[in-house]
């Protein structure tokens, strides 16, 4: 089997998402840490726009290697090319819930991660210190390191608007994270993964973000260890599932899914769904920023066109279901708040 070439960074949640998935599916790969742009340019490859991590080289229609980003479609391609040890459920209704959860992991749990990493002073200091040392392909002297620390920290803190992080929303994000942790910890008392006894792509999306919250960033790490020991242990297990005997394990039927899973979805429905809808409305109306009331508090952020695409992709997935499967999904999501984005 030909080895994939993957380019990423250790503190990148999406890099960790894909590495864990590749190990689970037993797909061989060569991993290149740091300086992704420079490495791709040295290979005379056209840079993806934008250069998001990780980058994986896939053959294009001309049978030439192309630098590819965006973990969700990459997983679907890998699922088609490597059908063993599936991460997408066969049941269409359950597969949609999995897709929804994967999007929530990639687009909402990442708000927790980015907020803590760059809003909190101790966390930003650690990230600013470590990121230059894992990103650059050569050793940095102290002066170079300090310059890069300052540059990276300023660049990232200036991008807090992307996730809606601010002094005004900090308490809302912190409480939502704790609500999510509590529900996820409860779920792990009953089963090993989100949808049953083996992982789906949603687990890998959750893992990518939570790996940083549990391991790298000081503030959420302390919260996780105090509140959710099962989540901490789950992260350690998710790191490498290559030995899991997946063929003997099952996903849960949709009607038998855990009540804790519904609690997780309800947190997303309360917090993330209104943001998706208001952001999409702002994109359509050409607004530069928008605000919405969430759980009694005001959330204000700049318009983010990519998340409008995420909402459309969710709707496309739902509209691709049969009438019977749509009914199953609507019944499962009833009163969660998630039904409003269908």
Locations of the language-model features?
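Active-site/pore-lining binding-face segments in mid-to-C-terminal subdomains
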Residues: 207-298
């Amino acid at each position: 089997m030909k080895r994939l070439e993957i380019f990423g960074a250790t503190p990148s949640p999406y890099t960790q998402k894909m590495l864990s998935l590749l190990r689970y599916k037993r797909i061989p790969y060569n991993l290149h840490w740091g300086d992704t742009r420079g490495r791709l340019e040295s290979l005379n490859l056209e840079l993806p726009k934008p250069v998001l991590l990780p980058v994986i080289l896939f053959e294009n229609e001309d049978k030439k290697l192309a630098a590819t980003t965006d973990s969700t479609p990459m997983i679907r391609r890998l699922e088609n090319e490597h059908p063993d040890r599936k991460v997408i459920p066969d049941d269409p209704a359950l597969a949609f819930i999995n897709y929804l959860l994967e999007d929530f992991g990639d687009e909402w749990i990442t708000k927790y991660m980015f907020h803590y990493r760059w809003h909190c002073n101790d966390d930003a200091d650690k990230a600013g210190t470590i990121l230059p040392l894992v990103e650059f392909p050569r050793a940095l002297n102290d002066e170079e390191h300090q310059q890069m620390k300052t540059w990276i920290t300023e660049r990232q803190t200036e991008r807090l608007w992307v996730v809606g992080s601010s002094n005004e929303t900090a308490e809302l994000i912190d409480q939502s994270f704790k609500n999510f942790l509590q529900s996820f910890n409860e779920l792990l008392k009953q089963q090993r993964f989100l949808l049953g006894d083996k992982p789906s792509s949603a687990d890998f999306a959750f893992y990518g973000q939570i790996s940083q919250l549990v391991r790298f960033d000081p503030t959420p790490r302390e919260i996780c260890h105090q509140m959710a020991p099962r989540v901490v242990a789950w992260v350690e297990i998710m790191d490498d599932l290559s030995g899991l005997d997946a063929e003997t394990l099952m996903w849960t039927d949709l009607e038998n899914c855990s009540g804790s899973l519904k609690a997780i979805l309800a947190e997303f429905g309360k917090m993330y769904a209104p943001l998706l809808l208001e952001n999409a409305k702002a994109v359509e109306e050409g607004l530069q920023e928008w605000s919405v009331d969430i759980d009694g508090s005001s959330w204000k952020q700049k318009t983010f066109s990519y998340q409008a695409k995420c909402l459309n992709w969710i709707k496309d997935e739902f509209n691709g279901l049969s009438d019977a499967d749509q009914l199953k999904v609507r019944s499962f999501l009833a009163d969660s708040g998630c039904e409003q984005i269908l």
